[in-house]
From Swiss-Prot:
It comes from Pseudomonas putida. Residues 4-233 form the ABC transporter domain. This is Taurine import ATP-binding protein TauB. The keyword Translocase applies. Pfam families: ABC_tran. The gene is tauB. The complex is composed of two ATP-binding proteins (TauB), two transmembrane proteins (TauC) and a solute-binding protein (TauA).
Amino acid sequence: MALLELERISAQYPGAETPVLADINLSLGPRQLLVALGPSGSGKTSLLNLIAGFVAPSGGRITLDGVPVQGPGAERGVVFQDDALLPWQNVLGNVAFGLELAGVPRAEREAKAREMLALVDLDGFGERRIWQLSGGQKQRVGLARALAADPRVLLMDEPFGALDAFTREQMQELLLQVWQRTAKPVFLITHDIEEAVFLASELVLLAPNPGRVVERLQLDFGQRYAAGESARAIKSDPAFIETREHVLARVFSQRQSLQERA
């Protein structure tokens, strides 16, 4: 049964000649890691913003647990590419910030924040200042903060896009570990093909102008990692390589088609 449903979603910005998104139908179910991948102009970030409730769709309906999404809410935790942390707060204060706004007592919110920091392998980092953290550590704090409110679904907007290649791989593996431990449904957008293939239980390919779904792939590489298989073994598997090359060819063909129309 789907927790999150998008039915015939379209989006068009004021003054734009063409829609950003057209006729998008998606569902996110329990324990699913849904990844949206597409070239620039395919509406990935716009799609996430609609689900988060930051903007309203021009047409269609978005529901969470059968209730229409009509604005931001704590039941949808968001992790951004820019860590968006509060520099005047320490790590613990950042993770507990949403709980503080919700009126959770201090002892309870700090205990929850420490639990989430342990989940993302930052046990003992609570008193550190944000400027003392590496890029990967900041993203771990952002993930812990999003999880602290116990959201129904986790939304991730190219969360590893600004990280170096080594740290990016570490964060991909951490996300799969957290996904397995928490059983939280995740909707993630990325422009990185290998990342998308590795993480997704379902991969949705978007084409641009307007953004629309052109292919859906059911994948198990992330589940294999969560079950204990090494990332190196998975990424050298001929099945992984074949899938990656198939997705790469689809994305390149979309870009070429876009250039020919320009």
